[in-house]
Design a protein with these regions (language model features):
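N-terminal intrinsically disordered, cationic/polar leader segments
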Residues: 1-17, 22-24, 28-35, 42, ...
Length: 105
């Protein structure tokens, strides 16, 4: 759980950078930031335990995949709004993970 929270923290920071790069028209850096975000989302998906997690894990995987798809769109369309959408989804998920951590820790 600690690793998930660390990944989420890095992901949210990198999403902010990607958004800033779009607004600043720094397209090469935008691409690097979005690629880092996608790598982190893929790592989060890889960490899911599909054998034991049931429907919750399947839904998390779908949410992560949706975020990856939206980031590809954000990159191609230079859309800070799509990055904002991803940040909103992920901030809600992060709150859930933090709440779980508080109950377990």
């Amino acid at each position: 759980l600690e690793l998930v929270l660390v990944l989420f923290s890095g992901l949210m920071d990198e999403l902010e950078r990607a958004r800033s790069h779009i607004e600043g028209r720094r397209f090469e850096k935008k691409a690097q930031s979005i690629n880092k975000c996608i790598d982190i989302l893929n790592a989060l998906t890889s960490s899911l335990e599909f054998e034991t997690g049931g429907e919750l894990v399947v839904n998390l995987s779908r949410l992560y995949d949706h975020c990856v798809y939206r980031l590809y769109e954000a990159s191609g369309e230079l859309s800070a709004e799509k990055i904002d959408e991803v940040m909103l989804i992920l901030s809600n998920l992060r709150e859930g993970w933090e709440g779980l951590s508080g109950k377990l820790g």
